[in-house]
């Protein structure tokens, strides 16, 4: 009788250890997936960056600004140059 109780308790303890290990592995997998999503999003943002400055972006000359923008001489930021062409 005592050995059956001991085996049952040992089995429950073993089951608890296996389940907690599985849960830890699941949490680690979830962390890896979230990290991968964040890294992918960061890479996508970097891929969309352009070599020119957008409206009100800092600049030192007209060549720094994107198309249809020019560098404002006093404030050193990109402003619209007044053109509409595509």
Curated annotation (Swiss-Prot):
Gene Ontology terms: cellular component: extracellular region
Q: Where in the cell is it found?
A: Secreted
- The protein's name: Omega-theraphotoxin-Hs2a
Give the domain section of the comments: The presence of a 'disulfide through disulfide knot' structurally defines this protein as a knottin.
Q: Which residues form the propeptide?
A: 21-50
According to the UniProt entry, where is the signal peptide?
Answer: 1-20
> Any remaining note in the record?
Negative results: has no effect on voltage-gated sodium or potassium channels in DUM neurons. Has no effect on mice by intraabdominal or intracerebroventricular injection.
- Describe the function of this protein: Omega-theraphotoxin-Hs2a blocks voltage-gated calcium channels (Cav) in adult cockroach DUM neurons. Reversibly paralyzes locusts and cockroaches, and causes death at high doses,.
Q: Which GO terms describe its molecular function?
A: calcium channel regulator activity; ion channel inhibitor activity; toxin activity
UniProt keywords (A-Z) are: Calcium channel impairing toxin, Disulfide bond, Ion channel impairing toxin, Knottin, Neurotoxin, Secreted, Signal, Toxin, Voltage-gated calcium channel impairing toxin
Knockout or disruption consequences: Its natural mutant mHwTx-V shows no effect on locusts, cockroaches, and mice.
Pfam families tied to this protein = Toxin_12
- Give a yes or no for keyword Transit peptide in this entry: no
> Which tissues is this protein detected in according to the database?
Expressed by the venom gland.
Major location, coarse class?
secreted
Tell me the PROSITE patterns matching this sequence: HWTX_1 (PS60021)
Does the keyword Ubl conjugation feature in the UniProt annotation? no
Which family would the database say this protein is a member of? Answer: Belongs to the neurotoxin 10 (Hwtx-1) family. 17 (Hntx-9) subfamily.
Q: List the disulfide bonds.
A: 52-66, 59-71, 65-78
